[in-house]
Amino acid sequence: MRGLSIALAALGLGLATPLLAEPSPSVQVQVEAALAEAPKGTRFGLLVVDEAGKVIASVNPDQRFIPASNTKMFTTAAAYALLPGMDQPDVAGGTQVALRPGGNKHVPDVVLVGRGDARMSSASDCKVDCLTTLADAVAAKTKVVRDVIGDDTAFPDERWSPGMSWNNIQTEDGTAAGALNLDDNQLKVAVVPGVVGKTPTVTVPAYYTVNNEARTVAASSTPTLALERAAGSNRLRVYGEIPADSKDWHQWIGIDDPALYTAWTFKGLLQARGVKVIGQPRSANRSRDPLIDRACDTCGVGFAISGTPEPFASLTPPPLAEDVVIIDKVSQNMHAQVLFHRVGAHIGTGSTDWSVKGLQQVFAKAGIPREGYDFSDGSGMSTYNRVSPRAVVALLRWIDAQPWGKSWYASLPIAGVDGTLKHRFIGTPLAGNLVAKTGTLNATNALSGTFRAASGKRLTFAFFANDVPDGQTALPTMEAVLLGIAASN
């Protein structure tokens, strides 16, 4: 494959230990041969080094690639580096509840104050970080409230990643993220077939209304059922065909205003506890203001919102380190985006700009070349993100030297064992061995992490495939390359 760049000894990783020597010609030949079998037009980037920094394999290591969910590695590493008490209960992020005096016969509004927790749950079997705990607290204090307000103002109102494809907004992968979140900001839509020729039964929480255009068709027919929801709309269109013998069909959909959904859910919980709600659920948001962003250059650590009523009850979520495991193992986009804004809120206003500044501060200290990355979000859903293989390897080697490095590496999927790598590399020497973050986006595959080669050497790698032709995948090629490198070293 033409255009393969072989790293020279003079090129470093931005770390104290430089890259040493050229990759072995035999290994490089193997890599070239494997990449030649990839879908035509695919652009690859690869860098593999050993523990001493010696380059094992190198393909376009300084070119920049869309990283997809490899972005999450940068987000979670920055969180570990900047946010205090990652291994302690997340007192700073827990949702609070307050009563705000109202003008209607002095009936107060109830306000849920979000502070950047991505894990709060309304599930009936919830044990920790439960919205019902706050509902119980309100019911013990008053029997009537006016409006139920979801206060999302701890972060600016930037619910989606700049550069995210609009068609992802209705999906669970592209659901909105904010300071106040509930149930992963997604809802389940279930469809059960009916009598042939009739509409099936669609079940979804009443937060959404349904336009059911679907039809039940003869058993053994090909299902064509689909969902559609316009951005900003709470109306679902269900259409297509479901066979009469189909098992229950379900799909998760995103939520555009998580704070409003949380307030809507909280209203129901209050009513179930005998609290009369005479008003409506609504959300309170804070528009992003570039002037405030610039003014915060001198605001110190963090950014305080004025006018928030004094809370009388709070939740304490589990440690953020546990959420890092969720983010990296299963590649949870919304959680990653919330953590990204937590980084920005720690040093500034919580805006995307401040969150990016937080990442840049950390990576400058790590010696990661600035030209090696650009980020527009924390999850990897943005197509504006760019990283080089060299920048990723630099990040991974720097993390190795941090006191929290082992905890961070434990959050990554293990090949053939768990997370997004559970069904990959099975039956190969890399099963149970390779530990890495995956990444998948339109025309993009990514995989970066570490593995033990046949010799026992621990190798660190970053591997990207961009511009993969539609309907094809680069994964078999990438896996073949890594297996070959493992066997040859």
Can you annotate each of these PLM segments?
Residues 1-7:
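Bacterial N-terminal signal peptides that target proteins for export
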Residues 56-59, 330-333, 337-489:
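Small-residue-rich helix-loop
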Residues 35-59, 282:
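A short, well-structured edge-of-sheet supersecondary motif
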Residues 58-78, 82:
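Short active-site loop at a secondary-structure junction
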Residues 46-48, 93-98, 448:
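Short beta-strand scaffold segments in enzyme catalytic cores
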Residues 22-25, 29-34, 81-370, 454, ...:
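Conserved serine DD-peptidase/penicillin-binding transpeptidase domain
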Residues 16-18:
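N-terminal signal peptide c-region/cleavage motif recognized by signal peptidases
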